[in-house]
Amino acid sequence: MNSRPQAFFSDFGARCFYRPLAPKSDFLCHADFLKMITLHQLRTGYPGKVIGRQLSATAQPGTLTALLGSNGSGKSTLLRTLAALQPPLNSVPDSLLLAGKPVQQYARHELARMLSVVLTHRPDSDALTVAEVVEMGRIPYLSTFSAYQRLWQKSVGADAAAVRQAMEQTATLPFSHRPLSTLSDGERQRVFIAKALAQGTPVILLDEPTAFLDFPSKVALMQLLQHLAHHEQKTIILSTHDVELALQFADHLWLLGTEGIVQGVPATLAADGSIARFFQTEGLQFDAATLRFTVSV
């Protein structure tokens, strides 16, 4: 099944895209698609505590963006703000735009069809099977009553197609009947990514998805996310401490520091010294040619 966005021209002459397996009226026009996420002088944090100041950056469809920064720099806070799980500290509406529209202006059901989130801390769902977890990604497309029914009945129609496709893409279909509690960390991570894919959103946000995984699983996960961004035209943003993997797989970097965000493609940020300056630590050397770090003994 071809799940890439299908282009068409609206009555106004704008190039638009249907979202696969979403209602036919749900489409995004090319002007909005150029910058799916826009931050402009965004301030993040909590009442009485500012964590991120003057944050400006963009993320486009078809790209994998890695958010890098030290512990306590505000990566998780920024992702939660992007996901509208906590409000920006700015009073200016255009400080955070999603497809050209202020995030605060989206209704909850609209937002659930625009972006999905894979957080480090997830609700307890160990008693559910893999298929049941992935099916929950379709709840934004159901009425309240049918949403509760769906927890106890098999998915049908477009919902079943979306669930199956998501599990095929993440290689979770072979163990779809297994309880989540029986899976490895890497398998569990793929299940929650499958749930995000089943949700059918153009944007996916992930908070440290490679944490607690062994190295082969980290590589496999980054390959999957890169593939989804490029072939499904998803806008994917992930935070990570696996810097070298991010340099190899990400299309763009957001370097989150005390003075804001430095953004760009890895090769450019390596060549102009931005990465070396950002990770400047005694005894740590960065090779811009190989995009690798070495430790001086």
Task: Give each language-model segment a name.
Residues E135, R150-F175:
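Conserved ABC ATPase "signature" region
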Residues A83:
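Helix-to-loop junction immediately C-terminal to a conserved catalytic motif
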Residues P179-L183:
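Conserved ABC ATPase signature
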Residues L68-S70:
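The feature captures the beta-strand-to-loop junction immediately N-terminal to the Walker
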Residues I204-D207:
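Catalytic Walker B motif of ABC-type/P-loop ATPase nucleotide-binding domains
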Residues T240-H241:
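H-loop/switch region of ABC-family ATPase nucleotide-binding domains
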Residues F279-V297:
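ABC ATPase nucleotide-binding domains
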